[in-house]
Structures are given as C-alpha cells and as structure tokens.
Regions:
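Short, basic, low-complexity termini and linkers enriched in Ser/Thr/Gly/Pro
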Residues: 268-291
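Helix-to-beta-strand junctions that scaffold the AdoMet/dcAdoMet cofactor pocket
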Residues: 110-111, 124-126
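Short amphipathic alpha-helix with an adjacent loop that forms part of the alpha/beta core around
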Residues: 91-95
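S-adenosyl-L-methionine-dependent methyltransferase catalytic module, highlighting the catalytic core
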Residues: 114-119, 129-263
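Conserved N-terminal segment of class I S-adenosyl-L-methionine
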Residues: 1-90, 100-102, 117, 254-262
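A short SAM/SAH-binding and catalytic strip from SAM-dependent methyltransferases
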Residues: 102-111
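Active-site micro-motifs of SAM-dependent methyltransferase domains
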Residues: 90, 108, 139
Length: 291
C-alpha cells in the first residue's frame, strides 16, 4: 500500500473527483493504506480503478466489476495485472487463489450479498485478509437533508429524504456492525478490527457538496473528466477551505457514531485442499470477461 497521510489523499482526490467523492474516498484511502494486503490481491468491485491506483504502490493481481465501461477504464490505470467483467456472486477464480481481497464501498450495492461473501471467502486462502468498507444505519440519519427536518419537528420528512438518498445511491444494505459481524462469521471470516469513519458533521458537508459539485456532472458528460482545473485546490479559496475540512473529517475517529464502517477480516483456517494457482479460472467466466 502507499504510505501517506490523509492530506495527500485529499489533494489527490480533489484534483480528479467531485468534493463528495473526495471526502469519502480520501478517508477510505487513509484507512486502506494502513493495512498490509499480501499478494496475490483481488479487488472486488474495482470500478474504474481510480481507488486501487490511489492506494496501491504494487500491482493488484486481479479486479472484477459488472460494468464493462468501468472495467475498460480500470485497464488504463496500469495498476491491475488483470481485470474482468464478472459478478461478485460468481467469481471466476480458483479456490484459495488469493492471499488478500479488498472491496471498497461495494457490498452495500449488491443484492445477492450472501453469495458474494461466500465467493470472497472461497477464493481467499486460510489466514488471508479481507478488507472492506460499508455504510452504517447512520448514513441516512446523518445527512443534512434528514437532520434539518427533524430539528424543525418534521421527522417523517427527514426519514423520507434519507430513504430517497439511499435509493439514488443504490444502497441495499446499510447495516450495523453486529449484522456485518454475523454475516462475515457465517462464511468463515472473522472480524479482527473495525473503525467508524465520517461523523455527523462530515455527512452534512457530504450532503451539501453534492449540490456544490453539480457542475462536475456536466463536465464529466462533455469532456469525460470530473475536474477541468485540477490546481483549483491550491488557488481557489473555497477549494482550499474544503481541503482543510476534508483532512479534518478524514482523520477524525467518531467511533460507533459514524456513517461508515471500515472492516478488517481474517479467513479462519480449515482443513482444505492446497491453494489454487492465482487467477486460475475455476469455472467459465461470463462471455464478456476479459483478463
């Protein structure tokens, strides 16, 4: 992993993605960078590869994602040895093929969650690490659009906003630490460490920054880039203020009173066959898969 502080990751993300993404991804990059992930390493839900390229100094042996366009972009990052269009519920790799698996802000978007967790456990070697991040039940409650109506005596309106935001975020699972611990335990993954990240105040900024960053949607559509002026983080006063805030929020530890949970797991040892060769297909992948 790249060893760097939150300020480094904030600067790097603000140059390439909207503020709301930079807030979350910089905090997550700081946490992921603090965990040793031996190779071979699999990235489940690699997306366009931006996050993997940000946190890894060494190559990532394999990445998978359902979106062919995202996979095509991930290939251009130069960090993945192989990338495939594949489902997390049917990973196209041999049993025990990987020493580590990472998955950043992906599991909450997957309806067949149990199948995906079982597949992650299957391809992970005994004693191997699985590191992931997920939203907690606080995600919707901490949004500014949910907080203000509650303060005004309109709790139903606040709850409706939270449900709407989860829906447009395609969140199927925003569960507690205990729920995740039980899910992981059921597939042979022991939760060995966790940390909450992004406080209530951080989520207010997260919510507001969606609207502040609305012009980036047009930029992405017209020019294929979220940010047209990367150096604005240095020269534009509002961006400098935002950068300082993002560092503060990314470094703070809100404990259980957090919108997101970072999980570090270890696969339990068991009597089993010898590890398979890294990246060896145990089944035929989708016809679209490319490695």
């Amino acid at each position: 992993m790249i060893r760097a502080d939150c300020a480094y990751f904030v600067d790097r993300h603000l140059r390439t993605v909207p503020v709301h993404r930079a807030l979350i991804r910089a905090a997550e990059a700081t946490l992921f960078a603090g965990v040793d992930l031996p190779r071979p390493l699999l990235d489940v839900g690699c997306g366009d590869g931006h996050f993997g390229a940000t946190v890894r100094a060494e190559p990532i042996d394999a990445g998978i994602d359902l979106d062919p366009r995202e996979v095509a972009q991930a290939k251009q990052q130069g960090i993945y040895r192989g990338v495939a269009v594949a489902s997390g519920a049917e990973l196209p790799f041999a049993d025990q093929a990987f020493a580590s698996v990472m998955s950043n802000c992906v599991l909450e978007h997957i309806p067949p969650l149990e199948e995906t967790l079982r597949e992650i456990s299957r391809v992970l070697r005994p004693g191997g690490a699985f590191v992931t991040s997920v939203p907690s039940p606080n995600f919707a409650r901490f949004l500014l659009g949910a907080t203000l109506p509650r303060a005004l005596g309109l709790p139903a309106l606040g709850e409706a906003y939270g449900r709407w935001f989860n829906r447009i975020s395609r969140h199927y699972h925003t569960d507690s630490l205990d729920v995740w611990r039980a899910r992981l335990d059921a597939v042979g993954l022991d939760l060995v460490r966790w940390r909450g990240y992004l406080s209530r105040e951080a989520m207010w900024l997260f919510d507001l920054s969606h609207y502040y960053g609305a012009p980036t949607l047009l930029s992405k559509r017209l020019f294929g880039r979220w940010v047209l002026w990367p150096d604005k983080v240095r020269y534009w006063p509002p961006e400098r203020w935002l950068a300082r805030r993002l560092v503060r929020y990314g470094e703070e530890d809100p404990g259980a009173d957090a919108a997101y949970i970072f999980l570090v797991c270890r696969k339990r040892s068991a009597v089993s066959s010898q590890p398979g060769e890294p990246l060896a297909f145990s089944r035929q992948p989708s016809a679209r898969a490319e490695c």
